[in-house]
Design a protein with these regions (language model features):
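Conserved AMP-binding/adenylation subdomain of ANL enzymes
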Residues: 3-73
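Glycine-centered tight turns that cap/initiate beta-strands
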Residues: 93, 117, 153, 245-248, ...
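Active-site glycine-centered loops adjacent to acidic/histidine catalytic or metal-binding residues
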Residues: 101, 125, 148, 205, ...
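Acidic/polar alpha-helix N-cap and adjacent early helical turns
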Residues: 321-332
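Gly/Ser/Thr-rich phosphate-binding loop
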Residues: 44, 71-76, 84-142, 155, ...
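Conserved ATP/PPi-binding loop(s) of AMP-dependent carboxylate-activating enzymes
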Residues: 149-153, 164-194, 231
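Phosphate-coordination loops involved in phosphoryl transfer and adenosine-cofactor binding
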Residues: 19-20, 94, 169
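AMP-binding/adenylate-forming catalytic core of the ANL superfamily
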Residues: 74, 178, 183-184, 191, ...
């Protein structure tokens, strides 16, 4: 309802961005985040995009690219942020930093405020329907544990096993009609049909709907079922990453006869740190002191490196396969 006289209102283009904005991401442009969150919006809105790719993500090279390219806005994959945090990376001339792919915890957000002098915005989406949920610090401070609210133009819900919206844990779904939603899986009509239930695109991600946003629990395959608990790995990973000895980590469920699964952590330590049983116990206790008791990793293995995608995400599927293989070897 509009009431009264509607005057002519002159608006600045600054509403769409700042004149000095300049975009960059270390992510490959073949990834939906690099393509639809950086390259295409930059081209559409006339914002410069820096093309600079590293063979291996390094903090010093990141700082050089930002400086030489006069970058003001960066989209970082979560693993890139973890590497920067582990190196005590610091830069204060960025206007915005965004991240998508995995949830960020309270410690990472606090680090962003200290070392980047800003609040990191979280995005959520997938190739089939990109950036449907987001935090925006220009509107409100993010709430730890929530990945944000539906972006205008998208209707997002959480469905139970019967395809009915629920406030309990369920599958995150997006209603048809979103501009960023796929048309189809190319020449795969059956796979396309299975991606939808009625009018909803099913993401395959588990979540919970709250009044102030949506909680991401994990990929359906990533959720660990242990002694009746359903456990998302991200919270445990984020906790372990706050320990000064941990460089990166992947958490999965390992098959177990009595508990169905146990929480298993695969950890890469920082240079100079000793990977032994004592360190494993220290890290277990570290999690016990900070999270609910059922969340601590009952087993920890140390690796030289973790399997990663080209976009910097830990490939938990390969870690689960490794855990299954360990079980088979233990039975022999």
């Amino acid at each position: 309802l509009l009431s009264g006289h509607i005057p002519g209102v002159s608006m600045s283009h600054n509403y769409l961005g700042h004149s000095e904005d300049c975009l960059w991401t270390p992510a490959d442009w073949a990834w939906i985040g690099g393509l639809f969150d950086i390259l295409m919006p930059g081209l559409a809105l006339g914002v410069p995009v820096v093309a600079a790719k590293m063979k291996k993500f390094l903090p010093e090279a990141t700082k050089e690219i930002i400086s030489r390219g006069q970058v003001r806005n960066v989209f970082f994959p979560p693993t890139a942020l973890r590497i920067l945090k582990a190196s005590n990376f610091e830069i204060h001339n960025l206007r915005s930093v965004a991240c998508g792919g995995e949830p960020l915890g309270a410690e990472m957000l606090a680090w962003g405020k200290r070392n980047l002098n800003l609040t990191i915005n979280e995005f959520y989406g997938q190739t089939e329907c990109n950036m449907v949920v987001s935090n925006c610090n220009a509107e409100a401070d993010p709430i730890s544990g929530l990945m944000g609210k539906p972006v205008p133009g998208h209707k997002v819900s959480v469905l139970d096993q019967n395809g009915v919206p629920t406030e309990q844990e369920g599958e995150i779904a997006v209603e048809r009609g979103s501009a960023s939603m796929m048309l189809e899986y190319w020449r795969k009509p059956e796979q396309t049909e299975n991606k939808f239930y009625a009018n909803w695109l099913l993401t395959g991600d588990r979540g919970r709907l709250h009044r102030d946003g949506i909680e991401f629990i994990g990929r359906d395959d990533d959720v660990i079922t242990s002694a009746g608990y359903r456990i998302g790995p991200s919270e445990i990973e984020d906790c372990l990453l706050t320990h000064p000895s941990v460089a990166t980590v992947g958490v999965v469920g390992k098959p177990d006869q009595s508990r169905n699964e146990i929480v298993k952590a695969y950890i890469v330590l920082k240079a100079g740190k000793k990977a032994d049983d004592q360190m494993a116990e220290v890290l277990k206790d570290f999690v016990k002191e900070r999270l609910a008791k059922h969340l601590y990793p009952r087993e920890i293995s140390f690796l030289d490196e973790l399997p990663m995608t080209i976009t910097g995400k830990v490939i938990r599927k390969k870690l689960r396969e490794k855990a299954v293989l360990e079980c088979e070897q233990e039975r022999k």
